[in-house]
């Protein structure tokens, strides 16, 4: 297995953060990101960038973090107990975009690198990441295009890659207490290292670079779609699912909180406004009901 180079990974991640922020500012056309650099007492730090009150994006956050610690936290060793007690280094770019218009989907993306050290032993390392889409209104064209973009970036790495990571995404972003997916999925991968450092890093780069290519056309297509208070209230209600998932199930959120990460940056994924409604039921025959019946479950979007 080729030797991992964390300096190379960090340089890519910092550049990716810049490129995504520039792309989102161009899409929004009105607001700019504010940057907040921070340091962590135990080692490392990061830079959080948040855009608020834009013409298109109500809130968008794009975080870079690079943290170190003397021992792996429980969230990272739950499925790899042999790593308990190792020192670690973790770096990544994580972003969540909450658009203003309910016809534009919310989206999340993340690419990350972990390396764990122990004296007298080879380092243990892996890449993880992915991206997923959470529409509020059912536009089949958007979902198919999103998954086609995901499949296209996977193809150079093997025919089996897209179906594998698409399924993993469906399984990961599942809310058991709601019996529904968080959205329409995309890609999710973790523990990637068997192909060696260069190939694993290349795939992580493809996912990071492919995110905006997949999302920008959907934003452009829906940004001028008219909406009223009814659609806005439904969007705020559905945002509640985002909060439920991130605070109850998301491994990244738990990892950040357990490692003494920066709370403001970790909770940047939360929507700026959200509402809950007791025993909500969508009106039969409406687009909201179609979202529930046709979109909030795993589907093969490229073979309908």
UniProtKB/Swiss-Prot annotation:
It holds the Pfam family Coprogen_oxidas. The record marks 177 as: Important for dimerization. Its cofactor is a divalent metal cation. Substrate binds at residues 94, 110-112, 260-262. HAMAP family: Coprogen_oxidas. PANTHER family: COPROPORPHYRINOGEN III OXIDASE, MITOCHONDRIAL, OXYGEN-DEPENDENT COPROPORPHYRINOGEN-III OXIDASE, MITOCHONDRIAL. This is Oxygen-dependent coproporphyrinogen-III oxidase.
């Amino acid at each position: 297995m080729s030797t991992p180079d964390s300096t190379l990974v960090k340089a890519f991640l910092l550049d990716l953060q810049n490129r995504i922020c520039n792309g989102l500012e161009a899409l929004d056309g009105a607001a700019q990101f504010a940057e907040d650099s921070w340091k962590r007492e135990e080692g490392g730090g990061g830079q959080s960038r948040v855009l608020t009150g834009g013409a298109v994006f109500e809130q968008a956050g794009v975080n870079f973090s690079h943290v170190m610690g003397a021992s792996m936290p429980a969230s990272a060793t739950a499925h790899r107990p042999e790593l308990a007690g190792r020192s670690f280094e973790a770096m990544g770019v994580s972003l969540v975009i909450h658009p203003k218009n309910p016809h534009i989907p919310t989206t999340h993306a993340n690419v990350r690198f972990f390396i764990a050290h122990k004296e007298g032993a080879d380092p243990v390392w892996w890449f993880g990441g992915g991206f997923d889409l959470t529409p509020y209104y059912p536009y089949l064209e958007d979902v198919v295009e999103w998954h086609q973009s995901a499949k296209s970036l996977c193809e150079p790495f093997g025919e089996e890659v897209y179906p594998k990571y698409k399924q993993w995404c469906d399984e990961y972003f599942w809310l058991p207490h709601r019996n529904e997916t968080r959205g329409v999925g995309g890609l999710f991968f973790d523990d990637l290292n068997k192909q060696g450092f260069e190939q694993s890093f290349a795939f992580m780069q493809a996912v990071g670079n492919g995110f905006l290519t997949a999302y920008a056309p959907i934003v452009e297509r829906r940004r001028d779609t008219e909406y009223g208070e009814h659609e806005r209230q439904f969007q705020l209600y559905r945002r509640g699912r985002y909060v439920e998932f991130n605070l109850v199930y998301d491994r990244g959120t738990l990892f950040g909180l357990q490692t003494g990460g920066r709370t403001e940056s970790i909770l940047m994924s939360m929507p700026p406004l959200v509402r809950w409604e007791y025993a909500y039921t969508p009106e039969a025959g409406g687009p909201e009901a179609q979202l529930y019946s046709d979109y909030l479950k795993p589907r093969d979007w490229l073979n309908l």
